[in-house]
Swiss-Prot record:
It is a single-pass type I membrane protein. The gene is cdh5. GO terms for molecular function: beta-catenin binding; cadherin binding; calcium ion binding; protein phosphatase binding. This is Cadherin-5. Gene3D superfamilies: Cadherins, TCF3-CBD (Catenin binding domain). One of its GO terms (biological process) is cell adhesion involved in sprouting angiogenesis. Disruption phenotype: Disorganization of segmental arteries with supernumerary filopodial extensions that show multiple contacts between neighboring segmental arteries at 28 hpf. Failure of tip cells to organize themselves into the dorsal longitudinal anastomotic vessels with about a third of segments showing dissociation from the stalk, resulting in the stalk cells remaining close to the dorsal aorta at 28 hpf. Stalk cells also show reduced dorsal movement and loss of ability to regain sprouting activity, stalk cells therefore clustered near the dorsal aorta. It comes from Danio rerio (Zebrafish). The chain crosses the membrane at residues 594-614.
Amino acid sequence: MMKQCARRQMTEPVFRVAVLLALCSLSIGVDVHQAQKTPSISSAALQRHKRDWKWDKLYAYEETRPKNPPEKIGKLENTFFSSSTRYILKGDGAKDKFGVTDNGDIVVLAKLDRETQSVYNLSASLLNIHTGELVDKDESFVIVVLDINDNIPVFDSDQSGSISESSRAGTTIMKVKATDADDSSTENGRIDFKLLNGTDLFKIKPNGDLIALKSDLDREKQSQYLIAVQAKDMPEHLTGNSATTVVTINIKDINDNIATFKKERYQFTVKEDLKPGSEIGLLEVEDKDEIQNKDPTFALQSKFNDVFDIKRTKEKDGMLSLKVPLDYEKEKTHKFIVIVEEHTVSRTPDNKGLLKRTEVIIDVTDVDEPPIFNQTEYTFSVFEGPFKNPVIGAVSAKDPDSASYKIRYTIEDANCPVDVDPVNGYLSLKRTLDREQESLYTFQVTAHEDVLNGLKSSTMVSLKVLDINDNAPELTNGSYVYVCENDKPNTIIGTIGASDKDENSGRFRFTLARKSSNFSLYDNQDNTATIVLKQGGFSTENSEEYVLEIEIADGGTPEQKSVNLLQIKVCTCQSGRRVEYCMSYARTGMSVSALLAILLCIITILVIVILIVLRRRYQKEVLVTKASGEIHEQLVRYDEEGGGEMDTNGYDVSILSSACHDSSFRPSVGPALYAMVKKPPACKGDMAMMIEVKKDEADRDRDGIPYDTLHIYGYEGTESLAGSLSSLDSSSSGSNLDYDFIHEWGPRFRTLAQLYGVDGSDSDSSY
């Protein structure tokens, strides 16, 4: 049987530690008890009783350095223990922190830390050293680590609190928190708090509650307190560990101060053209409370409430603004009193009796202002149609400045139907208005000072065109009137209506302008009329066209009438007058507008023809009356041997030059187209003969230039609007021109001199 002994070290207060140590030293042998189970021998058999293990907790102090030999804390005993067996420990800290000797003593091998691990669970077993088998089964036990005061108190990271100013005495501000890693069930882990300063305003309870002692905390005097707090373990003992921290106490603001003005007088300068709604200046106020607790209100003297306004800014100051325009000519200075009040103060204000009123002075400066109309907008109305008096109204503006310049009025829109008198502003119509085309005109009238670089302003004018009964009614729904072949007399074949472009037209009256033998019309007295068939027997094979002349009167003042033609078709219908086929009529008539267009085209064509004839006559007269010196001749001659590249690209030279060999291509001899000119006197041969010879040579020479390159313009006829291009008046006789100076030009111009020389002969030749 196994016995066990253990050193018992119970957790007691510190002042009993010495007694326990003495008792433990004496109990090494005394506390060791043996639990032997002696077997009883009977005659029948030898029986073994069941073993009963009884284990107590084993105790060991933390932070004890290992000793040599190791410190013994208990002993294992077993009846099966012998020299061939040994004890083995298993579990937490076995072999590194705890061990067992050969005789069963449990020893501490390393320094223990209760804050790391306070309880170790182990088991003991007895092993046969030869076979390696267990002699007895394992039994468990516990080793408890005893605490010593080896840790100091630790404060939480956030040690701050707040209290509203003027709070009652005894109000809890916050709870100071600190922890000690030592055993809290002993004096080692219990903490006591103490204030090191500020004891006249605050106190702290043992549990850490921080309490205010006074009710006159004022944030405006001091908004924050820094209090040193000490935390110490081992209460009621001089010894022990302690720590110190600083606790921040913030005084929260309440609205216990009223807003007051910083100055007794505020003065601003404002131009008279400042627009309403604009800011004038800031009325600064002073309030020691925080901005969220400021709640000032501003009040002006009653007669200035319509001119000025004060609004509170984000900073809780007063912003003075303008409500209506100022006028320097009426009042140059404005003086008034502004009062600031605060009705949400939580208690009697600390700053009562300070400045709550201030005087505001506003000096208005003069500026050159544009003309001002006596109305912001003008509205006039006029009846459409012809008018007797063109004046529809007037606009008026004046110069508000002391200079009081004259005002002139203009309308810049050229399409405006209204004109304005530049001096007195009378508005008059420029043309007749038609409400059906446009019922409302809106335009701008400008007034400007009658000086150089004068200012100007504008106003909007609306002209409403009133209606008169000037439009005749028109027929509607006429396309839905038809007669069926199988219609019987007194059948309603359709209903017509009327419309009028005028406003508020009265009831329309319908009558037949010309009686009809086939149809009748009944006025329904509701702006409609019914067409009724008098007799039947209509057929689509009959080409006769049926037209009703219907007179419609609108009943207005003056009454307008119109005669409308209603064409009635003859149709083949199914049951219920459902149209299957309608006979169409060829319309031979023509509208008045088409006739006018055709007539206008005819007149235009006649005018163009007359102008062309007159111009041609004028050209003929000018051509006949030209002087002989104004007609010149241009002689184009080619000296080179054949035409150039540009001449030969456009035609076939062989075809042109072969004209003399084919008599069919020779031009027929016709009447002379050129006027007769004088034969040059200096020429010794007949000019006509010489030209014929040259022409014949050119026709026979295939390598030469075409025969038609010799251009002689004598007279181009009378049909050209540009007149004659001739450089010589070939038809004139008795020329007085002298060409003897050509002989002086040299031998190159000898032939030309011969052509235009004078030989005394007056005979003429034609060419």
